[in-house]
């Protein structure tokens, strides 16, 4: 291939890849699947390897570069990145608006722009001749850290912007964009799954995870964690306003190819602002990322300059903060809980504190290393955080330089607090474990896990019933559940004949649970719901899985060396093989169907939104997947159907805007019945 022909093909591939990156990472509307995208990237990599002289810094293959030689350089901002003043109530918000009107003049026409306040890491991106030249953290507001090598790996950050787009957006070739780097909940959950599998403490929240990721010295790690960048401000290279209005700036940034938060609203009155804030707080739990409030800005740049700044914040903008999902309280005690796999988890018992509208009295401390990292003692004051349904976590010790008088060091036990057996710590892992397989705490947690929703789903078998069954010696392993009689259940406290009959019905129904749920219920270390599903689809039967070697297991998605070792250790233990046989005798399903390739639902992507009248979200997801379909968490052009129930949110709106078919539960059930016919 000639040099000219190679150059032409390389540029064509780059344009195609940039186009599809924009559709996927910015618009959430992919046109091709991952395999097709990967093939485009491989072709480009192959051509660039054959013609290294044609490699340019803005090529999609150059997102991941070398490590910074020595940390990150300090660089002054073109214009200070100031924090915003906060308000925490409607009254305070109205007071701010009144001050703005007084300073602007009562006759001034003022328009406000309301935007979701993303809870992430502020970032300034500098472009020279349309090319990404530098990425700076906020730092202290005056001086930030140069994290350009890491910013380049964020797929929603354009590495270059074509002249045509610059002209369309009326933006000079040299400019600055400010925005927020966030870690979506899906990426955060994946990160913590990986950390748990490695024996590490999970990250406390998406914001901390994003901040830690962007400051790592390993760009390849940043590339693996899907960070997003949302642009919200545009400046000239001299740090001056690039546009006359904030709304105009946001539209221009979207034109340039940046991801801009679509949840924004122009308001001409404080009443409209308050309405937007209230809607945002209700909408908060339905987003795929964390927000902690709403930013309200005066729209006009001229009026912004007239209002000016206080010593530390602009007068023309304010952050309305939602109810805190963090709080400060005192650690009254530290107790150790024993999980189903024998893991010992220290838990902080706290003086009651309101966090995000919930009274919190306990928070996990994960393991001994985390207590040491925090420098925590009993009696210390700590900051705790919770986001959505995440278990409260201790984030830091407040004023740890001086512990309050009377604080006590916590010493991790050398014996299991539940059974007194020896505890061990495997080299390379952070957790201590009880090795006694007959430990009552392990058995209790194993039973609760086995019966829980999402596993065998035995409704009515909660902690109170499990404790009584154990206390009376009626169950000693999970297989004993299937030997329980009505007479035994009726003898339990608060268990009449009707309740006993209902519970036995639930137990009997659980015998029909699919193979992946049975695998998940066994409690094999590191085998969660997704891994259990992958194993069931790969092997199709319990017997085939039990005979698989470590090497064979590691060919399965989601199974690495640590997981394969845990699976083999579990099935090589005679006690566990006996348990499996007793469950087989109890009538549980030990075979499963591999995903149907010719199914009517095969290859179809569904998105669930709102509350369905008859099916839970998990039940609907399971039925679709068992019929060969796929359930996604976000709507795109590739979505085939959105299944909408009551109180459907933004996913329904997006489906309507994209023309994606919307069906209700009845239509879904009809599709499933047609599939079974």
Curated annotation (Swiss-Prot):
Q: Which family does it belong to?
A: Belongs to the NAD-dependent DNA ligase family. LigA subfamily.
Q: Which cofactor does it need?
A: Mg(2+); Mn(2+)
Q: Which residues bind Zn(2+)?
A: 416, 419, 434, 439
The active site lies at 117 (n6-amp-lysine intermediate)
Query: What is the protein's name according to its record?
Result: DNA ligase
Q: Which reaction does it catalyse?
A: NAD(+) + (deoxyribonucleotide)n-3'-hydroxyl + 5'-phospho-(deoxyribonucleotide)m = (deoxyribonucleotide)n+m + AMP + beta-nicotinamide D-nucleotide
What Enzyme Commission number(s) apply to this enzyme? 6.5.1.2
User: Quick one: a GO cellular component term?
Assistant: cytosol
Biological role stated in the UniProt entry: DNA ligase that catalyzes the formation of phosphodiester linkages between 5'-phosphoryl and 3'-hydroxyl groups in double-stranded DNA using NAD as a coenzyme and as the energy source for the reaction. It is essential for DNA replication and repair of damaged DNA.
Per its UniProt record, what SUPFAM superfamilies does this chain match? Answer: BRCT domain, DNA ligase/mRNA capping enzyme, catalytic domain, Nucleic acid-binding proteins, RuvA domain 2-like
Give an example GO biological process. DNA repair
Q: Which GO terms describe its molecular function?
A: DNA binding; DNA ligase (NAD+) activity; metal ion binding
Please list the residue ranges annotated as the BRCT domain: 596-677
Q: What class of enzyme is it?
A: ligase
- Provenance organism: Acidobacterium capsulatum (strain ATCC 51196 / DSM 11244 / BCRC 80197 / JCM 7670 / NBRC 15755 / NCIMB 13165 / 161)
Query: From the record, what ranges are coiled-coil?
Result: none
